């Protein structure tokens, strides 16, 4: 297990709820080289007095050195935690997706707000699969924290939504800053069509939901 020691006085923002630990706040990182070089590996975060502060995902390639998973010492970061976080996020928003216009792009997971650092998920096509395609989930894995747990995240999304189509969209600038490869691909089922009509308020706009590009009309 990696151990991140925070510089004296730099723990205050963490204790106030800041989910990011910047490289400038890190005094040292202890652990095997293969773990230190694995983006997203779980680390124990401690104060300079060696007091437990958090469990976080460590990324040596980013200026955001660690992203907090939990402040509870008795809460392990494992498949069960990932499943619970995805379930809780979807429980807050699935009803909204089910009642939304099938052509609306509805946010289902909101990164740190849902305890899933860097993960954004939007649903299109209705939770019940308008158009016979089963709808689409478009995911952005914008941090090593969730990149590390991609497989169980996708499994949980498939199970909880019943949506068969999951597509990974990449933000190049964000993933470059995390030292992650840029990927755009279907993770399950079918890739969304290049051009779909997406409702924004009262208007329908032609959009490529794989990239967020809005076509000129």
Regions found by a protein language model. Name each.
Residues 109-116, 120-127, 147-217:
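Non-catalytic substrate-recognition/targeting regions of SAM-dependent transferases
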Residues 129, 136-138, 206:
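General beta-strand recognition
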Residues 125, 134-147:
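A short interface-forming secondary-structure element
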Residues 1-125, 132, 193:
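Non-catalytic accessory regions of SAM-dependent methyltransferases
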Residues 57-62, 144, 210-215:
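A short, sequence-level motif marking secondary-structure junctions
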Residues 78-85, 145-153:
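Short amphipathic alpha-helical segments
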Residues 42-43, 136-137, 164-167:
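Structural motif
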């Amino acid at each position: 297990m990696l151990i991140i020691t925070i510089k004296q006085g730099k723990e205050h923002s963490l204790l106030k709820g800041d989910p990011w630990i910047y490289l400038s706040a890190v005094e040292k990182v202890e652990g095997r080289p293969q773990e230190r070089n694995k983006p997203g590996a779980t680390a124990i975060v401690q104060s300079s007095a060696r007091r437990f502060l958090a469990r976080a995902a460590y990324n040596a390639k980013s200026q955001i050195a660690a992203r907090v998973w939990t402040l509870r010492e008795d809460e392990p970061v494992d498949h069960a935690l990932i499943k619970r976080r995805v379930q809780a996020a979807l429980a807050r928003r699935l009803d909204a997706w089910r009642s939304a216009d099938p052509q609306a792009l509805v946010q289902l997971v909101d990164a740190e707000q849902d305890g899933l650092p860097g993960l954004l998920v939007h649903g299109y096509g209705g939770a019940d699969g308008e158009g016979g395609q089963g709808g689409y989930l478009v995911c952005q894995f914008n941090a090593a924290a969730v990149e590390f747990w991609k497989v169980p995240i996708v499994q949980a999304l498939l199970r909880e939504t019943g949506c068969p189509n999951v597509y990974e969209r990449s933000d190049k600038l964000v993933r470059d800053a995390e030292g992650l490869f840029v990927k755009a691909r279907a993770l399950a089922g079918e890739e969304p069509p290049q051009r779909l009509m997406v409702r924004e308020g009262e208007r329908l706009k032609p959009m490529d939901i794989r990239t967020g590009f809005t076509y000129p009309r």
